[in-house]
């Protein structure tokens, strides 16, 4: 965050944040409201939600939704972390792909026909068409997402500029702490759910406010969220579904439904199910997203109605500092998308999916807290933060 502010000289900082489920197809550790508090306490001025229909998607759709929201908010510059760290290389890679589009598409098809996943086929195709050191490594997850951010900016004819910060020490999927001060999200999550989990182990790697809010959430609601806690619900749902039922679920391709129903029979945990399910063609992340759609009962028809090929249909405001509130007041008339401070009176297919996802997310919380959280989510107004006193209002 501090590096971003230093690099961009920004007046205000806006974060577009996933809701209950994340792009890699798993539940967020804590609710979006607690994560909003974390972001505000760490210097973000406006926190807005990326709807489920965009947030639990491949990088291209995820980026398209996020950029459309930032565009609507009249953001002048974005900043993202990447393994490469040189913004010129991203633009150069996009240019090469555009010039070699026919060859690139042919190679992707060729590698997929050989049994590779789309992600692997795309990565291999890039290796074949990219030869200069001025191109990015498209096998790295943050490079891929950054590439799609810039591609979305260009596709949406935005005047937004892009900056990137190089990720050091820890890689995105590292499962252990390899540095004294920097850790991957994967390693932090693994530590939190280990047998001898302790918040003290992760404190050196996260802001003090984040550690405090994580501990507070677990104390208040009795848990942090991961896939294993939803496995009994997930297995029950699959055991009552037919192949035809599964085929209606978003991201379930023909043939995958039979493999899923077969492997669930002998799986006693989500991890063992995923180990049995994954293949060369279907990556872990791709399958986790499909499993998320099964859990939330998100159908192909619902995603079609959400019209994800276009921009996000609204802006759900989750939190703001006083500086962020001033920015919104000054620019409200210029912002063309509706800004939602709650969702109880707004109706849209994208929001219907969001409401289901929230209901599923809180299903592991014990009553009566579960019902309270579900009622609050639709009526919850944006969290306000006074950055001068470092207090929530």
UniProtKB/Swiss-Prot annotation:
<dbReference type="InterPro" id="IPR014729">
    <property type="entry name" value="Rossmann-like_a/b/a_fold"/>
</dbReference>
<keyword id="KW-0694">RNA-binding</keyword>
<keyword id="KW-0436">Ligase</keyword>
<keyword id="KW-0819">tRNA processing</keyword>
<dbReference type="InterPro" id="IPR008513">
    <property type="entry name" value="tRNA(Met)_cyd_acetate_ligase"/>
</dbReference>
<dbReference type="GO" id="GO:0005524">
    <property type="term" value="F:ATP binding"/>
</dbReference>
<comment type="similarity">
    <text>Belongs to the TmcAL family.</text>
</comment>
<dbReference type="GO" id="GO:0016879">
    <property type="term" value="F:ligase activity, forming carbon-nitrogen bonds"/>
</dbReference>
<keyword id="KW-0547">Nucleotide-binding</keyword>
<keyword id="KW-0067">ATP-binding</keyword>
<feature type="binding site">
    <location>
        <position position="142"/>
    </location>
    <ligand>
        <name>ATP</name>
    </ligand>
</feature>
<dbReference type="GO" id="GO:0006400">
    <property type="term" value="P:tRNA modification"/>
</dbReference>
<comment type="function">
    <text>Catalyzes the formation of N(4)-acetylcytidine (ac(4)C) at the wobble position of elongator tRNA(Met), using acetate and ATP as substrates. First activates an acetate ion to form acetyladenylate (Ac-AMP) and then transfers the acetyl group to tRNA to form ac(4)C34.</text>
</comment>
<keyword id="KW-0820">tRNA-binding</keyword>
<dbReference type="Pfam" id="PF05636">
    <property type="entry name" value="HIGH_NTase1"/>
</dbReference>
<keyword id="KW-0963">Cytoplasm</keyword>
<dbReference type="GO" id="GO:0005737">
    <property type="term" value="C:cytoplasm"/>
</dbReference>
<feature type="binding site">
    <location>
        <position position="81"/>
    </location>
    <ligand>
        <name>ATP</name>
    </ligand>
</feature>
<feature type="binding site">
    <location>
        <position position="167"/>
    </location>
    <ligand>
        <name>ATP</name>
    </ligand>
</feature>
<dbReference type="GO" id="GO:0000049">
    <property type="term" value="F:tRNA binding"/>
</dbReference>
<protein>
    <recommendedName>
        <fullName>tRNA(Met) cytidine acetate ligase</fullName>
        <ecNumber>6.3.4.-</ecNumber>
    </recommendedName>
</protein>
């Amino acid at each position: 965050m501090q590096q971003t502010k230093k690099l961009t000289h920004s007046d205000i900082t806006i974060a577009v944040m996933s809701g209950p489920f994340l792009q890699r197809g798993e539940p967020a550790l804590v609710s979006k409201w607690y994560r909003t508090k974390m972001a505000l306490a760490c210097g973000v001025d406006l926190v807005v939600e990326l709807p489920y229909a965009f947030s639990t998607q491949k990088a291209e759709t995820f980026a398209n939704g996020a950029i459309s929201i930032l565009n609507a908010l009249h953001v002048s510059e974005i900043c993202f972390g990447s393994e490469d760290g040189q913004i010129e290389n991203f633009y150069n890679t996009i240019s090469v792909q555009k010039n070699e589009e026919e060859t690139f598409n042919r190679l992707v098809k060729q590698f997929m026909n050989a049994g590779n996943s789309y992600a692997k086929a795309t990565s291999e195709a890039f290796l074949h068409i990219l030869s200069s050191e001025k191109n990015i490594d498209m096998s790295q997850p943050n490079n891929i997402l950054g590439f799609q951010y810039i591609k979305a900016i260009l596709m949406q004819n935005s005047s937004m500029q892009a900056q990137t910060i190089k990720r050091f020490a820890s890689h995105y999927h590292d499962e252990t702490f390899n540095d004294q001060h920097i850790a991957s999200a994967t390693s932090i999550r693994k530590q939190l759910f280990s047998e001898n989990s302790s918040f003290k182990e992760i404190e050196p790697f996260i802001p003090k406010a984040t550690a405090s809010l994580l501990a507070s959430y677990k104390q208040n609601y009795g848990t942090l969220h991961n896939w294993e806690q939803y496995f009994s619900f997930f297995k029950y749902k699959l055991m009552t579904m037919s192949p035809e039922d599964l085929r209606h679920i978003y991201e379930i391709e023909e043939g995958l439904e039979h493999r899923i129903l077969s492997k669930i029979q002998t799986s006693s945990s989500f991890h063992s199910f995923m180990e049995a399910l994954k293949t060369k063609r279907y990556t872990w992340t791709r399958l986790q997203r499909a499993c998320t759609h099964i859990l939330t009962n998100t159908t192909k028809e619902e995603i079609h109605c959400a019209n994800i090929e276009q921009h996000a249909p609204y802006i759900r405001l989750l939190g703001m500092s006083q500086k962020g509130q001033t920015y919104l007041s000054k620019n409200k008339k210029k912002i063309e998308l509706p800004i939602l401070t709650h969702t109880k009176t707004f109706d849209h297919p994208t929001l219907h999916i969001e409401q289901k996802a929230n209901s599923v997310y809180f299903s592991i919380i014990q009553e009566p807290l579960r019902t309270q959280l579900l009622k609050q989510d639709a009526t919850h107004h944006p969290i306000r933060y006074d950055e001068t006193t470092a207090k929530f209002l």
